[in-house]
């Protein structure tokens, strides 16, 4: 069975376990538009940067689906995407942009923005699952969702979900997440006991659960899946974009005082992570000796920055999506790497000299750290070994500021 078939059967089994009937596989129109906006990837601030930190959201897409209770049976309605589809059509036809290019720098559909800005001058058509259709202004819909005590949440795709009952898909993800935690606990026991065989066994078991968790989103966005629903797929990616934008802006605010996702402290953002540096903001105080600066101090500082940003998700989820605390608590992030330096070239192409990875020091045994390289083709199979070694050595010299 492929990943889609495995995921589909797991959802069917979960539904049957709840005593629910599963609908037959729907017939799909070959001409149906199934493309959905993908993950947010920022353009990096190109060049060599000093003292980099990164903050990473935990299991972003599974967590988004759980937080907003995304499931075909929990959809209340959909704001008709007339404005956003017209913009995409214009971009892809008249402006000759790709579909992905049309979503460059976008974090939500225009209809969602109209609701959040409480626009009185924008009329929105809402198609409800019960067959009703209503035309309301952005301001009116904002009041209905956020001020009327309805158990509704609004995704960045303009899809309205209920909190009255937990959907099958979020429930399945919750169970898988819990099972993975149990397997990771067994893995830790095996590691602590020094049992190599059991360590390998439990590591593979927890890895399978991780794959299950991360592949579910892709499966339900596959038109071949029985539970395919573009509204859920694009709700996941766009809501994820909105959350990552907030995380980046909040990290920048902690460091510089300005809420800006591309502010002075921000270097790069990719899917569920943001890369930042406090060094440019603090450089004068560091040079004057006002702020003590060492590897240990930087690690402590960046831990504090990420902890401060992480505390803001609960309030943000309520304000941005009307997501209650009981559901938003799954949205969490933590500090990932601290690097002494990093080279950023373009999207998906960068390298960093990591000195700490999630609390584990890598600058040990006389080593300056561990090089994390993405998209630089240092280890291509068609490149001779001596050239691979030369390129790796050259990159390390750049990152350690040694003469080339």
Task: Please give the residue ranges for each predicted region.
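C-terminal polymerase-core module
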Residues: 275-404
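Non-transmembrane amphipathic alpha-helical segments
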Residues: 173-190, 209
């Amino acid at each position: 069975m492929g990943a889609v078939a495995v995921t589909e059967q797991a959802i069917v089994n979960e539904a049957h376990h709840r005593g629910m009937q599963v609908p037959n596989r729907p017939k799909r129109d070959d001409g149906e538009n199934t493309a959905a906006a993908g993950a947010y990837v920022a353009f990096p601030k190109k060049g060599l940067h000093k003292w980099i930190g990164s903050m990473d959201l935990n299991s972003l897409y599974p967590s988004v689906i759980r937080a907003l209770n995304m499931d075909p049976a929990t959809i209340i309605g959909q704001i008709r995407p007339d404005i956003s589809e017209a913009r995409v059509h214009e971009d892809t036809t008249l402006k000759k942009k790709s579909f992905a290019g049309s979503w460059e720098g976008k974090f939500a559909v225009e209809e969602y923005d109209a609701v959040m800005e409480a626009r009185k001058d924008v009329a929105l058509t809402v198609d409800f699952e019960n067959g009703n259709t209503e035309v309301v202004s952005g301001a009116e819909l904002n009041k209905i969702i956020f001020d009327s005590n309805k158990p509704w949440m609004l995704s960045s795709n303009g899809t309205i979900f209920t909190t009255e009952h937990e959907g099958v898909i979020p429930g399945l993800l919750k169970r898988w997440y819990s099972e993975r935690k149990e397997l990771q606990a067994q893995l830790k026991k095996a590691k602590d006991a020094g049992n190599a065989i059991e360590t390998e066994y439990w590591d593979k078991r927890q890895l399978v659960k991780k794959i299950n968790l991360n592949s579910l989103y892709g499966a339900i966005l596959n038109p071949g899946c029985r539970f395919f629903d573009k509204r859920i797929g694009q709700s996941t990616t766009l809501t994820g974009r909105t959350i990552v934008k907030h995380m980046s802006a909040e990290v920048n605010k902690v460091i510089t005082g300005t809420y800006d996702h591309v502010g002075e402290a921000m270097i790069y953002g990719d899917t569920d992570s943001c890369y930042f540096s406090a060094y440019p903001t603090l450089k004068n105080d560091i040079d004057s000796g006002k702020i003590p600066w060492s590897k240990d101090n930087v690690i402590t500082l960046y831990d504090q920055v990420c902890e401060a940003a992480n505390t803001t998700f609960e309030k943000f989820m309520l304000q941005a999506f009307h997501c209650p605390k009981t559901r938003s608590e799954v949205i969490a992030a933590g500090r990932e790497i601290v690097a002494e330096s990093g080279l950023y070239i373009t999207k998906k192409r960068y390298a960093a000299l990591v000195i700490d990875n999630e609390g584990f020091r890598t600058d040990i045994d006389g080593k300056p750290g561990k090089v994390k390289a993405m998209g630089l083709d240092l280890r291509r199979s068609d490149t001779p070994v001596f050239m691979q070694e030369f390129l790796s050595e050259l990159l390390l010299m750049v990152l350690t500021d040694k003469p080339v």
